[in-house]
Each structure stands twice: as C-alpha cells, then as structure tokens.
C-alpha cells in the first residue's frame, strides 16, 4: 500500500473511504482517469538476432504522437478517447460527458491534478450535470495510486512498443485497436486494482 506522506495517508484513510461511501449510497460507479501520450518510435521489450550479432529494433524514421485519455473502474469497465491535438479543459469536459452518457448510473471520477482538471469550466459542468457526482483529485506526485496508469503500461510496453508503424494512420489505428482490445478484458482491468499501491480501490477491499 502506498504510504509515506501526510496527503497520501489522508487519501487512503479518510478521503477515498468517503468517496466510496458516497458511491455506495448513490449506486455510483467510480472511474479512475488519466491522460498520456505515445510516440510511434517508442520501443520496449527485447528483440532477437543471430548469435554474435547485435539485435536491431526496426524503426521507420517517421515520428508521430497521439494524446489519449482513459478511465477504468474496479468493476472492469473502461472508457477512452484519442485526442487529435493538445489536452485541455474542453477535451476533459468532453471526456466527462462521454463517461456520464455511457452509463445509466451516476459517475464519480478520480484523477490527478493538472490545471485542466481543476478549471472553473470543469466545476461549472459538474454543477450542471446531476449524473456526475464529483471529480476528486489524487494527492500530488502519487501516480502509483491511480489504477489507470496500468493502461499506458499495457499499451506502450505490451503492444505498441513491439510494432513497426510506418504511417500516422497505421499508428492511430494500432492505438485504437489496442485500447479497444483492453476494453474487452474486464478481468485484466480489474487486475489493475490489485497491485500493491492500488488495492485500496479494489472492490474486494470493501466487502
């Protein structure tokens, strides 16, 4: 369990249990959200070569990047959105709208604290949207508390990092295919909530 700072301890012992209680009383679904970017020249893992030869990872020389945002729940659901430009407040609100319209129950969002997440426009949207019960900010410098961080590890290290993508179109399709494949793996997503630092948010924690 992630501990070691007053803010983290407060999150684990007070703030998140209160959020969880609100979710139970309202039959709300808690989503942990995060955004990231990935480049087409990212490589991970290992490759092979004949004995005595240096392994070479194939690269195309072309570089593309895509910004993304995703959210996962301890129930194994996931939502995501690829972003053609930069991430900003309007994009975050658009994603929040996608979350609340894709479920027939209230939504609570937990995320980190960049300015786009705490802007006045976001607060105004929350006030006007009864299906969104709140956007709660994780303690600063504590990404390990966010189960959604595992989405990017799955995407970059497990899939994209082993591909050779020659065009921006191929790259975008590969990103969306990987995210969609993960969306169809609820048990995999639930596993993101069972690591040392995210187990506090696992459903079994509250049984």
What is the meaning of each model-derived region?
Residues 1-207:
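Short functional hotspots at interaction and active-site rims
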């Amino acid at each position: 369990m992630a501990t070691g700072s007053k803010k983290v301890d407060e999150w684990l012992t007070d703030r998140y249990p209160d959020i969880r209680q609100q979710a139970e009383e309202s039959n709300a679904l808690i989503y942990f959200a995060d955004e990231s970017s990935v480049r087409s020249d990212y490589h991970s893992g290992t490759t092979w070569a004949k004995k005595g030869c240096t392994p070479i990872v194939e690269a195309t020389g072309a570089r593309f990047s895509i910004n993304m945002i995703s959210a996962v729940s301890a129930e194994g659901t996931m939502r995501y959105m690829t972003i053609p430009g930069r991430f900003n407040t309007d994009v975050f609100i658009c994603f929040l709208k996608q979350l609340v319209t894709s479920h027939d129950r209230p939504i609570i969002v937990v995320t980190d604290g960049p300015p786009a997440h705490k802007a006045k426009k976001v607060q105004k949207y929350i006030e006007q949207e009864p299906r969104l019960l709140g956007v709660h900010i994780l303690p600063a410098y504590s990404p390990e508390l966010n189960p959604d961080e595992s989405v990017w590890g799955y995407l970059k290290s497990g899939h994209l990092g082993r591909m050779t993508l020659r065009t921006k179109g191929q790259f975008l399709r590969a990103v969306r295919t990987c995210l969609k494949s993960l969306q169809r793996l609820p048990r995999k997503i639930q596993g993101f909530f069972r690591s040392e630092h995210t187990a506090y948010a696992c459903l079994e924690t509250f049984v």
